[in-house]
Design a protein with these regions (language model features):
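A charge-rich, low-complexity, intrinsically flexible signal that marks solvent-exposed coils, linkers
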Residues: 1-108
């Protein structure tokens, strides 16, 4: 599955709850280390999730602080690395949609 096919769903989920595309992008940049320009290039290339995370310039070390349940599974217990990164991102977008402050979402 391509990251580009899921990205609009992340944005729609956030916007439906009064949040912005810019906040979604900020979360993705925080998690992966991509610049805005590099993020847009990945979207344009329709990169799959595995490549998207494998090519991430600097996966944020604080992502290990992300805890909780997504789709009935605890993100910290997921063993497959790519799936865990996807679920980390899902969890951050869920927190955004639930109205959490960006400072809390970004674990600062």
């Amino acid at each position: 599955m391509s990251f580009a096919s899921v990205y609009p769903l992340y944005v729609a989920k956030a916007e439906k709850k009064g949040r912005s595309k810019a906040e979604v992008d900020e979360i993705i940049r925080w998690l992966t280390g991509y610049s805005q320009k590099a993020l847009e290039a990945q979207l344009k290339k329709k990169t799959d999730f595995e490549t998207f995370f494998a090519e991430a310039p600097q996966l944020n070390s604080s992502r290990a602080l992300i805890k909780g349940v997504v789709c009935g599974v605890r993100v910290e217990d997921i063993k497959e690395p790519t799936m865990q990164e996807i679920r980390y991102l899902d969890k951050l977008i869920d927190e955004l949609a639930k109205g959490k402050a960006m400072e809390k979402i970004l674990r600062t």
